[in-house]
Swiss-Prot record:
Protein name according to UniProt: Uncharacterized protein ORF4
Length: 136
């Protein structure tokens, strides 16, 4: 396991057995596990918050009252092929010009919205929205 700082608290990047039997990496923090789709363990830069080789991962849960409108996410930074953990939370709204994520006082445009499902143990599954964003 590799320690990472995740939305204001300690978190872990761990190997996760996907519900279909595929090994995936996960970000774990605040007592919950979030899938880190397309993040390789060997790509993690520590200490610090940079990932190489991937350009998206952002999760938001409306299914669990513990999280409310808070956004668990990794946001792409200005440099190509690098991303960083972008902060401790935010909100998402849907103005006329498209979805926007507001995180740590910054406004991020949402490029794509998809649905993923996370296996938390035994037969318990929870759904998350995956927001692919472009950090200004």
């Amino acid at each position: 396991m590799v320690d990472v700082e995740m939305f204001g608290c300690g978190g872990l990047l761990v190997s996760h057995l996907h519900k279909f039997g595929t090994e995936r990496a996960c970000l774990r923090g605040d007592g919950a596990v979030f899938p880190a789709v397309e993040i390789g363990l060997d790509q993690l830069q520590v200490p610090g918050r940079l990932f190489d080789g991937w350009n998206h991962v952002l999760f938001r849960s409306d299914e669990d009252d513990r999280f409310g409108d808070r956004v668990q996410h990794v946001a792409r930074d200005e440099r190509p092929q690098q991303m960083r953990l972008a902060g401790s939370g935010g909100s998402v709204d849907d103005p006329d010009d498209g979805l926007l994520a507001h995180v740590d006082g910054r406004q991020l445009s949402v490029l794509e919205v998809a649905t993923v499902h996370l296996f938390l143990g035994f037969n318990f599954f929870v759904g998350f929205e995956k927001l692919l964003i472009n950090a200004p």
